[in-house]
């Protein structure tokens, strides 16, 4: 269980929905969507500022923190479209049914990514965090802020039925407890991050008691472009970081972007999820008050250096 200094407890003694980050270097991983290779390659890569240690070594030594924005399950992009549609055809035609090769491949990729996330948390402690996304809902629940979903096919219901058929009810209940334990927001010195843009202003007290507030959970994992209340990002930054004139930003995934990133909320929100790119965002906390710089890096093969491809100046 994480330290209360890192993740303050709620009234019942459980970890709350806010994670505090104090490392100088923070690496933010956009929506995984079954891309275990992206996360593995990142951990085995070298950051240009630290050429003598891999990212996983930096995280273990307390030099950096890796923050995943959730959505660990269900492939997206061109490969996701192909595989989900093939699995849906097999289900409808009855040729192979639910337990088809396409469905096994899809769920195998999702579970591979999930197991890597679950392994890294105890291995790296405060050096690794995974926030909750709307796809982190293996049983396709409509409770506790979650909603059933579909995109290319009936991913939610098909995935839940497959998991139950392969592993039974008991493991599904365990996975539900795990999903509900995920934090919603990570806060550094001059930035916050969540899966989706905050629908309404959020504050530390609300995040602390998130387990009993399904509306809050939904507002941080399901908000689409143009749905957030005006000023919600800035008010949330003030509440979580304290009022200040320095450059600050909220970083999110959820909605895909066409290039490296997109600004929203008057450049105070930075979206970084492009399912066709193997990219991460890197922040140096408190490096300068003249302006915030978020660097976007391409993740290559294990053992290579992260390659800087773009930079953003939100706030």
Task: Give the ranges of each region predicted by the language model.
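Feature recognizes metal-dependent phosphohydrolase scaffolds
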Residues: 1-315
């Amino acid at each position: 269980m994480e330290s209360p200094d890192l993740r303050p407890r709620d009234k019942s003694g459980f970890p709350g929905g806010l994670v505090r980050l104090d490392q100088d270097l923070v690496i933010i991983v956009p929506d995984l969507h079954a891309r275990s290779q992206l996360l593995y390659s990142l951990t085995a890569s070298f950051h240009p500022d630290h050429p003598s240690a891999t990212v996983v070594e930096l995280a273990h030594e307390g030099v950096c923190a890796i923050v995943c924005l959730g959505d660990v399950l269900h492939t997206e992009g061109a490969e996701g479209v192909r595989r989900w549609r093939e699995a849906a055809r097999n289900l409808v035609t009855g040729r192979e049914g639910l337990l088809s090769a396409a469905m096994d491949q899809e769920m195998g990729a999702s579970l591979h990514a999930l197991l890597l996330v679950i392994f890294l948390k105890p291995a790296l402690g405060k050096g690794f965090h995974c926030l909750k996304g709307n796809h982190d809902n293996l049983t396709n629940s409509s409770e506790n802020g979650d909603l059933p979903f579909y995109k290319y096919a009936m991913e939610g219901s098909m995935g839940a039925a497959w998991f139950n058929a392969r592993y039974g009810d008991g493991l599904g209940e365990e996975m539900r407890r795990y999903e509900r334990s995920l934090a919603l927001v990570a806060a550094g010195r001059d930035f916050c991050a969540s899966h989706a843009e905050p629908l309404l202003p959020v504050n530390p007290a609300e995040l602390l008691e998130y387990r009993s507030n399904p509306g809050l959970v939904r507002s941080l994992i399901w908000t689409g472009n143009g749905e957030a209340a005006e000023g919600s990002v800035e008010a949330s930054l003030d509440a979580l970081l304290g009022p200040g004139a320095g450059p600050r930003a909220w970083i999110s995934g959820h909605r895909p972007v066409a290039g490296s990133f997109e600004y929203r909320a008057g450049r105070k929100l930075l979206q970084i999820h492009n399912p066709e790119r193997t990219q991460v965002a890197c922040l140096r906390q408190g490096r300068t008050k003249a302006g915030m710089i978020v660097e976007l890096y391409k993740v290559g093969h294990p053992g290579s250096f992260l390659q800087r491809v773009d930079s953003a100046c939100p706030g």
